[in-house]
Amino acid sequence: MGCDDKCGCAVPCPGGKDCRCTSGSGGQREHTTCGCGEHCECSPCTCGRATMPSGRENRRANCSCGASCNCASCASA
């Protein structure tokens, strides 16, 4: 599976709470965390994630980060 450049989640998101990348040829998997320390799920971060678009869309996973989210991957230009 391909991974994005934010948190290592599979793209497209497979659903569920397991968003991992295969590392090496042995099939071992590496659990990835986000800049804010939250575990990686469908969104690069889950801290204050909004369900409706808030102007800070995470276009990689079709999720939106809430206004209180200060993760680098949720930064808006």
Curated annotation (Swiss-Prot):
Keyword tags: Metal-binding, Metal-thiolate cluster, Zinc
UniProt-listed InterPro entries: Metallthion_15
Superkingdom field: Eukaryota
Signal peptide: none
GO molecular function, one term: zinc ion binding
Stated family: Belongs to the metallothionein superfamily. Type 15 family.
Free-text function comment from the UniProt entry: Binds 5 molecules of zinc. May have a role in Zn(2+) homeostasis during embryogenesis.
Name of the featured protein: EC protein homolog
Organism: Zea mays (Maize)
